[in-house]
């Protein structure tokens, strides 16, 4: 297969890392932000065009956020495992290993999505009951969740396909596919809600349909590329060794992401006891704050992929330099995004719900969480650095302790003493700070740049 680097791809093994990190990260951030904006369109449209049911409808979509996040983030983590395995193989110039990993990832995504879709229909109602979703919100939330889960095969397929493209340094094709499907998502939202007078069922159907389009676009592109990641239908099967390697890296990464979502489910259950307005406010604020997270996380993904390829090629010094520059550039981008979001917070919240009480409560969340993203940047970059070397279990376990443990304990022991929205929000900076310290300790203990120094090739670090 061809090894020529095309204009929309990035050569991670040679040349300046400083210039290439943002070229990789910014399209990833744009892709994630577009995903959030299209999800936000669900919230905004039901919040503005469903009449008296607007607050209940917004709360229904928001109440599902932690559940959907847990499932999707678990598989996105596994997709990141595929990204690392493919990137390592590319660095080693082993096209056969790349081919096996690519086809394994595609089949696993579809099969895993189908399993989640079927299981989800059975457990959707019990999950929402565990979350203490208010009675007036429950039927809307259940309808949205069941429809959304039916679309899991195409949702997961898109994410695995995007991971495959990113492993070769192509972050623009996934962005383009999402842009096309996202516009379709918004148009379908408007059609179903305004023209057909549907509520949460309309935006859920639109989301599934749009994801099917983006997955189809990337699949067609993969079948037509001349790169080593080309997909051939006759080769679509699971390779045991490739799957084992993908899961060994991806499953801990997925668990790490899912732990956040699980902890957020616990927090959501506490927020749900504060009433429909608090749920709607938290949902609206989340759709704003996640934009800053998408920016910093894109540099973590860039760090993982760059380190993955260079580790495979035996360029260990270049791996350490990647981590350092990811910190610097990620910090600049995160600072800018946080400042912009805080300055425009109330206006952004009003897009989702014009209720003054919702805006006031939503601002409390943003003012508490956004400044704490400095801790988020630390553990995301360092976790991405470790994963690039195939070290995935330690970050997952430490995140489970720092995030999940602290947040569950907070809701169980601290929240009952002062049952206010602000009390719930304080757990975010505390748990994020603790996790950053734990992951930093892990890097200092593992010291991968020294541990793998013997693999360093003679190629100069340019």
Which residues does each PLM region occupy?
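N-terminal transmembrane alpha-helices
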Residues: 12-44, 48-52, 66-81, 85, ...
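Transmembrane helical elements of multi-pass membrane transporters/channels
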Residues: 23-42, 147, 181, 210-214, ...
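Helix-terminus/linker motif at the lipid-water interface of multi-pass membrane proteins
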Residues: 33, 37-59, 128-135, 191-198, ...
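Alpha-helical transmembrane segments of multipass membrane proteins
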Residues: 40, 118, 126, 160-164, ...
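Small-residue hotspots at the loop-to-helix junctions and early N-terminal turns
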Residues: 55-66, 141, 145, 204, ...
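Short runs within selected transmembrane alpha-helices of multi-pass transporters and secretion channels
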Residues: 76-79, 147-166, 174-182, 203-218, ...
């Amino acid at each position: 297969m061809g090894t020529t680097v095309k204009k929309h791809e990035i050569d991670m093994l040679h040349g300046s890392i400083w210039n290439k990190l943002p070229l990789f990260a910014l399209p990833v951030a744009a892709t994630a932000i577009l995903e959030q904006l299209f999800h936000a369109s669900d919230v905004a449209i039901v919040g503005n065009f469903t009449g008296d049911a607007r607050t209940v409808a917004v709360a229904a979509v928001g109440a599902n956020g932690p559940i959907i996040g847990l499932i999707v983030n678990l598989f996105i983590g596994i997709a990141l495992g595929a990204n690392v395995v493919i990137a390592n193989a590319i660095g080693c110039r082993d096209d056969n290993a790349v081919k096996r990993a690519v086809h394994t990832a595609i089949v696993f995504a579809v099969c895993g999505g189908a399993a989640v879709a079927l299981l989800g229909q059975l457990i959707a109602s019990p999950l929402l009951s565990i979350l203490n979703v208010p009675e007036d919100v429950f039927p809307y939330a259940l309808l949205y969740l069941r429809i959304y889960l039916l679309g899991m095969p195409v949702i997961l397929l898109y994410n695995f396909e995007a991971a495959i493209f990113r492993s070769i340094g192509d972050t623009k094709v996934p962005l383009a596919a999402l842009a096309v499907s996202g516009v379709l998502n918004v148009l379908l939202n408007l059609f179903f809600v305004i023209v057909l007078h549907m509520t949460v069922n309309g935006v859920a159907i639109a989301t599934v349909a749009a994801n099917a389009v983006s997955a189809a676009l990337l699949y067609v592109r993969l079948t037509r590329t001349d790169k080593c990641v080309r997909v051939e239908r006759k080769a679509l099967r699971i390779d045991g060794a490739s799957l084992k390697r993908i899961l060994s890296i991806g499953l801990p990464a997925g668990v790490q992401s899912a732990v956040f979502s699980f902890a957020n489910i616990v927090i959501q259950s506490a927020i749900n006891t504060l009433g429909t307005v608090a749920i709607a406010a938290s949902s609206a604020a989340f759709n704003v704050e996640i934009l800053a997270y998408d920016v910093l996380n894109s540099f973590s993904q860039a760090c993982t992929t760059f380190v993955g390829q260079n580790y495979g090629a035996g360029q260990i010094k270049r791996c350490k330099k990647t981590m350092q520059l990811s910190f610097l550039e990620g910090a600049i981008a995160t600072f800018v995004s946080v400042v912009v979001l805080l300055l425009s917070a109330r206006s952004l919240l009003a897009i989702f719900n014009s209720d003054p009480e919702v805006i006031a409560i939503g601002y409390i969340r943003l003012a508490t969480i956004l400044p704490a993203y400095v801790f988020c940047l630390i553990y995301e970059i360092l976790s991405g650095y470790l994963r690039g070397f195939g070290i995935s279990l330690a970050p997952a376990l430490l995140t489970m302790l720092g995030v999940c443990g602290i947040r569950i304990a907070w809701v169980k022991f601290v929240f009952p003493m002062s049952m206010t929205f602000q009390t719930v929000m304080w757990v975010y900076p505390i748990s994020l700070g603790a996790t950053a310290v734990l992951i930093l300790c892990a890097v200092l203990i593992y010291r991968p740049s020294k541990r793998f120094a013997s693999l360093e090739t003679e190629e100069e670090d340019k």
